[in-house]
């Protein structure tokens, strides 16, 4: 399958991003002559990985985990989070991460009736979820959560407020007719 065969009405764009408890805004304002004060942890702990699927309605299938994405983690995401959202005829579009090519994960997606489309190598510009992750990281910097629970709560809040207009625009921006 090629990118031209992606139907934005049926597509789930999959990817991962990482965050930590030290995310804060890069810039701030303060009254003239005063410095901005902010507490920022030096030891920011483990990376929190966010695995998600973007479609025209938003980010319906999101999971967070401490650490990176392994085959086992991706398999659990597919089984418990992604597959319940899929319908026969849907398309799962993802990059060439080794975990994405796991046979058991692919079998679960195909058993749900969805088709798998792999992006060309080194082409994040074809994956609109990259724009969603950029938006999420700005959200997390504003939230400035300082605990893993705080980060997870901020992510959950972001998923509730994202709406459907932004995902539609991100998908259109990546040259998929939406």
Where are these regions (language model features)?
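C-terminal anion-handling pockets and recognition modules
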Residues: 7-11, 129-178
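Short beta-strand segments
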Residues: 13-14, 92-94, 118-120, 172
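Acidic, metal-coordinating catalytic cores used for nucleic-acid/nucleotide bond scission
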Residues: 20, 69, 92-106, 121-126
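RNase H-like two-metal-ion nuclease catalytic core shared by retroviral integrases
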Residues: 47, 95-96, 117-141, 149
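Extended, low-complexity cationic-aromatic segments
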Residues: 1-80, 173
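Short, conserved catalytic/metal-binding motifs centered on acidic residues
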Residues: 14-18, 52, 78, 92-98, ...
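Short, structured coil segments at secondary-structure junctions
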Residues: 112-113
């Amino acid at each position: 399958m090629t990118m031209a065969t992606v139907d934005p009405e049926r597509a789930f764009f999959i990817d991962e991003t990482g965050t930590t408890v030290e995310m804060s805004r890069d810039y701030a304002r303060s009254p003239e002559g005063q410095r901005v004060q902010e507490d920022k942890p030096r030891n920011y702990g483990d990376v929190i990985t966010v695995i998600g699927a973007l479609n025209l309605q938003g980010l319906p299938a999101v999971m967070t985990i401490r650490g990176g994405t392994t085959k086992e983690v991706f398999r659990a995401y597919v089984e418990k989070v992604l597959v319940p959202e899929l319908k026969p005829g849907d398309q799962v579009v993802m990059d060439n991460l080794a975990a994405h090519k796991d046979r058991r994960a692919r079998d679960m997606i195909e058993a749900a009736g969805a088709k798998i489309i792999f992006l060309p190598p080194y082409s994040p510009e074809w994956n609109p979820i990259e724009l969603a992750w950029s938006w999420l990281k700005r959200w997390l910097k504003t939230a400035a959560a300082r605990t893993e629970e705080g980060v997870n709560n901020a992510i959950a809040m972001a998923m509730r407020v994202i709406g459907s207009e932004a995902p539609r625009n991100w998908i259109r921006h990546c040259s998929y007719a939406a």
